[in-house]
Amino acid sequence: MDGSHSAALKLQQLPPTSSSSAVSEASFSYKENLIGALLAIFGHLVVSIALNLQKYCHIRLAGSKDPRAYFKTKTWWLGLFLMLLGELGVFASYAFAPLSLIVPLSAVSVIASAIIGIIFIKEKWKPKDFLRRYVLSFVGCGLAVVGTYLLVTFAPNSHEKMTGENVTRHLVSWPFLLYMLVEIILFCLLLYFYKEKNANNIVVILLLVALLGSMTVVTVKAVAGMLVLSIQGNLQLDYPIFYVMFVCMVATAVYQAAFLSQASQMYDSSLIASVGYILSTTIAITAGAIFYLDFIGEDVLHICMFALGCLIAFLGVFLITRNRKKPIPFEPYISMDAMPGMQNMHDKGMTVQPELKASFSYGALENNDNISEIYAPATLPVMQEEHGSRSASGVPYRVLEHTKKE
């Protein structure tokens, strides 16, 4: 009897099994994923509100007689503060959740901009144009929300403390070095075709942006994770890898913004938003999976559902940006009959318009119809003076004297 009682006591004192510890680790990983996802959603939502506030400030100043500059208004400064707050939230989210989860959540900013643009900015629409124009946008918002839910639910649960040793080990690993070699070769080829061959296709430019952006998010996660550990008491700022990652983060972000600016000068913003989101998200998830090993240990079902969430979010963003209004470009128009004393350049009195092929130049004037002939610049006819010699120097134009009628 005593032997059986002692055996029961020993069984009660056994440590918890590995299955219970695995369940607790999975629960902790899901909580960290949820914290990171909420921070990212909050950050993107606040950034969208900030951008629309600043847009509202510019619209209000343009439509009023207020002589103040935009940076002297409280609305613009409130938008700037909210933008910094949102970017800080997105930056902090990388320290809690895997990179593969945070990157696709930028679809939240597209959803918020579509809704705020209609409500806050009061973008007007006619009832007859509602079905044609806005139904697809609302369907896109719904698909993007469904995709975001799938991303959060089936996101990878790989969590690793971003210590200096771990970041250095990932940086010199063979898979990432091979990935870096392929990315550098591809980036150089795209840059060559873009600069030397004038390959101004939007996919070429946004691929350059996406390749730089993948390095930006990899370095952002390392910097954010090391900063959070330092705040918690485990100082990581004395590792040189922290400063290497910080410099790479700033440099890639600056060049990424430069290429985005060039793309915005040639293509519509809605097209840039949809194509850029798809390319940047795909390449960034690939970089995160190689550098941080996000999908190691994940089962096939979770990976497939995560990929399905990405595809649904891609489709939602495409539908949202597909029907945005395209701005009408400014086309300068010159009517030669409006100039007093100037005869029409053409016999039938047709108006002429500047040639707008490469630059805003008035070097040649082109007829309005489809004639391909380009006329020379207009000049005033040279008139010889009646009372002077032909070789006399002076103004080669005849002066017309006007007298007032009493």
Swiss-Prot record:
Annotated membrane topology is:
Multi-pass membrane protein
Residues recorded as bearing Phosphoserine in the entry = S372
Q: List the Pfam families hit by this protein, alphabetically.
A: Mg_trans_NIPA
Provide a GO CC annotation, any one: membrane
Keyword list, A-Z: Glycoprotein, Membrane, Phosphoprotein, Transmembrane, Transmembrane helix
Q: Name one GO molecular function term.
A: magnesium ion transmembrane transporter activity
Principal localization reads membrane
Q: Which family does it belong to?
A: Belongs to the NIPA family.
User: How is this protein named in the record?
Assistant: NIPA-like protein 3
What gene is it encoded by?
Answer: NIPAL3
